[in-house]
Design a protein with these regions (language model features):
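Fe-S-dependent hydro-lyases/dehydratases of central metabolism
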Residues: 2-4, 9-148
């Protein structure tokens, strides 16, 4: 029997059968376009986690996120903007309570501040810190650049 897929994946294959878990087919996350929310939310959270793991989180005085390709072209309509804010705040797409999404986004927008991983607050004004670059990066049509 040959295992195929990411670690923890339930997809297995033998010479005559293929078993696939529903978790191999679908990603759990916010919409309306999970392809434009799940990845960006995970990437934003990983960036913040990396800052903390590197001992840099407390020294950060601001973050900027640049979106490229279709993440930029359809970002607001497909929820990429909200996904980035939630990810930076430490939320995960498969664990966030949907009832907390709107209040969390509203609080960030009204206060002009974002608590990275819920721990360290930095100024965050979307028009200045979440930038929609209407071009693609060379290695992938959907790119993101995080700067602290």
């Amino acid at each position: 029997m040959l295992r195929h897929g990411r670690p923890g994946s339930l997809a297995t294959m033998s010479s005559s059968t293929l078993s696939v878990s529903v978790f191999d087919l679908f990603k759990i996350g916010i919409g309306p376009s999970s392809s434009h929310t799940v990845g960006p939310m995970i990437a934003a959270r990983q960036f913040a986690v990396h800052l903390r793991a590197s001992g840099l989180l407390a020294a950060v005085n601001g973050v900027t996120v640049e979106l490229f390709g279709s993440l930029s072209a359809t970002g607001v309509g497909h929820g990429t903007d909200r996904a980035v804010l939630l990810g930076l705040a430490g939320h995960e797409p498969d664990r966030i309570d949907p009832e907390q999404i709107a209040p969390t986004i509203a609080q960030i927008r009204s206060s002009g501040a974002l608590a990275l991983l819920g721990e360290h607050s930095v100024p965050f004004i979307e028009k200045d810190h979440l930038l929609f670059r209407h071009k693609s990066l060379p290695l992938h049509p959907n790119g993101m650049c995080f700067t602290a």
